[in-house]
Amino acid sequence: IGNIKGINVLRTEMFLETEYNLKNNIDSKIFYLEAPTGSGKSNTAFNLSFQLLKKSDYCKKIFYVYPFNTLVEQNMNSMEKIFGQKQDIMSNIAVVNSITPYKVKNSSNINLYKNEKYAIEDYQKILLDRQFLNYPIVLSTHITLFDTMFGRSKGSTFGFHQLCHSVIVLDEIQSYNNNKWGAMINFLKAYAQLLDIKIIIMSATLPNLELLTNNNAKAVRLINNREKYFNHRMFANRVKVNYELLNRKIGIAELEEHILQHKNKRILIEFIRKSSAEEFYAYISESAECPVRLITGDSSIQERKDIIADIENMQEVILVATQVIE
């Protein structure tokens, strides 16, 4: 693949390699997928989970699990791009977290706040579907998953039976507390064996969890040679890191001066702290001659979508954001 010119060809190579290795190890319970950022892991995971459903007579449910709500939102948007024209599919996909309205079956867009013409029986069914996770495809965070697995309250146990014969995709596994990695892989392997669960664990920086467990249950790496992708020029040379400013403090005025020197460009400034982002946004908004936008963790889902859609058509814009933009 050294002479590949388009990144999509490289993504397709990985897509097919992982599918091939999955089919050759279809009886395994744990699968690892480690690939560079931007290599199409999400689309690959969609395919792998669907392949597991096709090859099984009893797997009927998929859980896509992420460490942050923003990733849930991002991957739901990806599904809408793929299946958006197929309402019969979208109606079976539900986001289960603390910020998304309860799912109304047989509709991908309607929620309780847009339509009040439901009888009390409808509300009861909608609530029961949510409590018992009665959806073929669930997108959620690890809080929902681990609460269902280990929670002792009545509400936690409602959806427990849905884990049986399911496919679970765990994304960005490195985001979890590394002190818990050993216990996590031990419990995941035990659950996979006892409840017949297929688990795909993926990340761009996947730790070797097999070193932390004495459970000898077979785990399969879906990429034969990770270096083939990580060291390929399409991924390895995308970013040039500049450390010139690392050893000194940069003030708001200096940062503003540097940005204003680059006219007719689309500029992103990312801050760690929300307060810093808001302070700089207020400062540069007074002097910039081009549109300036702000995205932080306080921005609503719809507001983020509107801003991103807005700036996609701009030739010159300054976007001030926190890490939520990633």
What are the roles of these predicted feature ranges?
Residues 1-31:
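ATP-dependent helicase/translocase motor core
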Residues 27-49:
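Walker A/P-loop
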Residues 59-84, 95-101, 208, 274:
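Conserved Walker A/P-loop ATP-binding site and its immediately adjacent core
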Residues 61-64, 68-72, 258-285:
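Conserved strand-helix element at the start of the C-terminal RecA-like helicase core
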Residues 86-150:
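Inter-Walker segment of RecA-like/P-loop motor cores
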Residues 94-106, 272-275, 292-306, 321-326:
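Conserved helicase motor
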Residues 138, 142-146, 156-191:
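SF2 helicase catalytic motif II
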Residues 205-262:
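Interdomain hinge/linker at the junction between the two RecA-like core domains of SF2 helicases
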